[in-house]
């Protein structure tokens, strides 16, 4: 009888063990994740001056269009497009790799969705480039500008989610 009592004390009940579950292990990111995150952050920092420059050139074209301004507007647009492509690849890849990490998941997902919406908006902006030879040039300009500023707004919101939400 004493042996059973000793066994009961030494051998914990299965229910007690189930009630005190160990915390989940820390999430470990790969070296590739960290490299992509670094590229992504550098690209994000470069985006702010590019978008500002593009907005200023675009406003100048809207007020007083010249061929030189249009050329520079196109060059900066290609730069923004390339940078967005790189950040979309690195960001989406890291979003997929980090999908099982519960810490900051909603913030990362909100950022990713906002930036993908901005991607689509910038593509639509490029496809809606005004053509001076068309009779509806004024309407095209307005649509292009609206798409551009909406896309910039989405990108800014996505940027802010990570900048201010990353404790």
Task: State where each predicted segment sits.
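Short, charged, amphipathic alpha-helical segments
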Residues: 68-79, 108, 138-150
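N-terminal targeting leaders of membrane proteins
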Residues: 1-75, 83-105, 163-167
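Short, solvent-exposed interaction modules
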Residues: 93-141
């Amino acid at each position: 009888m004493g042996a059973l009592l000793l066994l009961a004390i030494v051998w914990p009940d299965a229910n007690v063990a189930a009630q005190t579950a160990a915390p989940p292990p820390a999430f470990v990111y790969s070296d590739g994740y960290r490299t992509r995150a670094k590229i992504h952050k550098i690209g994000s920092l470069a985006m702010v001056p590019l978008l500002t420059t593009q907005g200023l050139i675009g406003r100048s074209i809207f007020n007083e269009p010249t061929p030189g301004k249009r050329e520079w507007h196109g060059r900066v647009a290609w730069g923004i497009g390339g940078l967005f492509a790189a950040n979309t690849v690195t960001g989406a890849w890291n979003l997929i790799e980090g999908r099982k990490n519960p810490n900051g998941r909603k913030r990362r997902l909100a950022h990713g969705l906002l930036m993908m919406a901005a991607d689509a908006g910038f593509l639509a902006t490029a496809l809606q480039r005004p053509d001076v030879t068309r009779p509806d040039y004024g309407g095209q300009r307005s649509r292009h500008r609206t798409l551009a500023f909406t896309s910039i707004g989405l990108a800014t919101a996505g940027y802010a989610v990570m900048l201010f939400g990353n404790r």
